[in-house]
Amino acid sequence: MAKKIIGYIKLQIPAGKANPSPPVGPALGQRGLNIMEFCKAFNAATQGMESGLPIPVVITAFADKSFTFVMKTPPASILLKKAAGLQKGSSNPLTNKVGKLTRAQLEEIAKTKEPDLTAADLDAAVRTIAGSARSMGLDVEGVV
């Protein structure tokens, strides 16, 4: 018989920097999960990633106080800002363009995000990422 699920917890935690302080501690503590066990497992799983890169994680909490977690790819906005060398996007993306990205850069981001996107192929994924870039005030070259 499968374990009874008591809930899901969605968090964004910097890679390799999970610790018991908020938001991790209170979110796991409410469900009675072992906070340090999660922190050690998450930090070990994100060891090969760029330190500090926010990683979305979905934690499944079970009735016997055990848990599993699934890591997603970093948010597209973070990857776009990193590729363009920006701290933040435009406050008015229609009139104030803050950077420029090429199709090659968008393809690289789309390949990174592919497991989490519902796009049918790489071209559709690139168009999805290009839309996110435009909404942040970035000019996109080579994508219609």
From Swiss-Prot:
Keywords attached to this Swiss-Prot or TrEMBL record, sorted alphabetically, are: Methylation, Ribonucleoprotein, Ribosomal protein, RNA-binding, rRNA-binding
List this protein's GO terms for biological process. Answer: translation
Sample GO molecular function, one term = large ribosomal subunit rRNA binding
PTM statement from Swiss-Prot or TrEMBL: One or more lysine residues are methylated.
This protein's GO cellular component annotations are: cytosolic large ribosomal subunit
Question: Would you say which domain of life the source belongs to?
Answer: Bacteria
Alphabetized InterPro entries for the sequence? Ribosomal_uL11, Ribosomal_uL11_bac-typ, Ribosomal_uL11_C, Ribosomal_uL11_C_sf, Ribosomal_uL11_CS, Ribosomal_uL11_N, Ribosomal_uL11_N_sf
**PANTHER family named among the record's database cross-references:** 60S RIBOSOMAL PROTEIN L12 (PTHR11661), LARGE RIBOSOMAL SUBUNIT PROTEIN UL11M (PTHR11661:SF1)
Read off the NCBIfam families from this record: L11_bact (TIGR01632)
**Function of the molecule:** Forms part of the ribosomal stalk which helps the ribosome interact with GTP-bound translation factors.
Subunit composition? Part of the ribosomal stalk of the 50S ribosomal subunit. Interacts with L10 and the large rRNA to form the base of the stalk. L10 forms an elongated spine to which L12 dimers bind in a sequential fashion forming a multimeric L10(L12)X complex.
**UniProt similarity note:** Belongs to the universal ribosomal protein uL11 family.
Protein name as catalogued: Large ribosomal subunit protein uL11
